[in-house]
Amino acid sequence: MLLMKIIDQRYLESDNRYSTQPCLLSILELEPVTEAATERLQQRLYAALPGLRRLHGLVGKRADEVPAVVELVQQTAIELRRLALNEVTLGFVGVVPRMPGRYRLVLPYSAQSAAAPALAMATQLVNAMLAGRSFNLKAGLARLRALADRRRKPRGSLMKTARTLLMSVIPQRALALPFFAPRLS
């Protein structure tokens, strides 16, 4: 039972049409969800992620035609990033014109390596809770932290290490090419 899925994602550089920060633009496809199911989902999410209560109304710009469950996905992604990366952002949620059931989510980020996985994890968590299944939240948060830590390691030191390894393998003496004198005949 797949209620929602991410059908497209793009990374936007800073100073884009939505934010001055770099953003992840995602298109979410959603099957209709009843109001009662959305209410149960919200209560389960609040129990699993108590910080979601603070995010209600702080999500940023939102279109009126967007179902509450899409806003819950966005709030969940923001809360997961806050818990895993200590990253607080506001986002944008809107409808995709002339495409019923598709919604645009824009989430600014500081750790690009964890932006898309955080949204994917949020959709998996929401799908699991809508279906009444459990979800290993601790493992997901640990994975997001690991992805963000990978970004923090300086690439310069990795390049120096790679260069040192290559230099130890490559012979130090210059290769001599045979000298070809022009023929005079």
Regions found by a protein language model. Give the residues of each.
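Preference for protein termini
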Residues: 1-185
